[in-house]
Amino acid sequence: MLDTTKLTMVGTGSAFSKKFYNNSALVTFTNGYKLLIDCGHSVPKGLHDLGFPLESLDGILITHTHADHIGGLEEVALYNKFVLGGRKIDLLVPEPLVEPLWNDSLNGGLRYDDSRELELDDYFTVRSLKTSDCGAARTQIDENIAFTLYTTLHVSHMKSYAVGLIDRGEEKVFYSSDTVFDEYLLDYALTMFPWVFHDCQLFTGGVHASLDELLGYTRYIPEKQQNKIFLMHYGDNVEEFIGKTGRMRFAEQGREIIL
């Protein structure tokens, strides 16, 4: 049993970044369970470069079905099946996304086999996570680990979720994944969690919270709460904005944070 929960940002980049890997985090819980949050197309390379082989993963949690969050799943599935001898890891998926993840995204490359057509659970141990359109829904995974999913607005008509990570009964981190600016969700996250990792686009308009919106929000909250916010999912021009984020900080790719 480890003393602390740890989070390493595997990638911090936006969907079109060429300097950073797709936004993704590797969480190591106190029982040793290693969870990858989202697996975009460049994330397997990011894991490799950080010294985390695919065989070190125990599970992957998916927050929504954009390619920069699921594009690396096919590689993981095929590697586990053909290189690691059919090893299955957990695939933790919000319940409304289980069917679209397979039917609309993954089956084109994973369905076919010499003997029969395959399904998602031929590659992963699929674990459905509870959701609620009215707020939060919690799923207990084992005696140590639980996840709370929060419905977010990212793209119209697309289901997307933020996730709260709980280890040994303690709220550890709120991870927004992708969402437009949502003052009420931020209020809740900063009240309930010691750390908040929030997506941040460096221009105004679009499908993510902008830096200007987040700066406007933090002007009205205590500095102690501002210090809890790490910004992620940013563009390649991020260096132009270093020192211009108030008390908030840009999450650094590859950096391990003790939660």
Curated annotation (Swiss-Prot):
**Could you tell me what reaction this enzyme catalyses?**
3',5'-cyclic CMP + H2O = CMP + H(+); 3',5'-cyclic UMP + H2O = UMP + H(+)
Protein's name according to its UniProt entry: Anti-Pycsar protein Apyc1
Q: Which InterPro entries match?
A: Anti-Pycsar_Apyc1, Metallo-B-lactamas, RibonucZ/Hydroxyglut_hydro
What is the stated purpose of this protein? Answer: Counteracts the host Pycsar antiviral defense system. Phosphodiesterase that enables metal-dependent hydrolysis of host cyclic nucleotide Pycsar defense signals such as cCMP and cUMP.
Q: Where is this region: Beta-lactamase-like?
A: 21-233
UniProt entry tagged with the keyword Ribonucleoprotein: no
- Please name the source species: Bacillus phage vB_BveM-Goe7
Q: How does it assemble?
A: Homodimer.
The record's comment on cofactor binding reads: Coordinates 2 Zn(2+) ions. One protomer coordinates the metal ions and the opposing protomer provides the catalytic residues required for cCMP hydrolysis.
The cofactor required is: Zn(2+)
What are the record keywords, sorted?
Answer: Host-virus interaction, Hydrolase, Inhibition of host innate immune response by virus, Metal-binding, Viral immunoevasion, Zinc
Sequence positions that bind Zn(2+) 2: 64, 66, 154
The molecular function terms in GO held by this entry are: 3'-tRNA processing endoribonuclease activity; metal ion binding
The family line of this record is: Belongs to the anti-Pycsar protein Apyc1 family.
- Look up the record and give one Gene Ontology term from the biological process aspect: symbiont-mediated suppression of host innate immune response
* Binding residues annotated for Zn(2+) 1, in chain numbering: 68-69, 178, 233
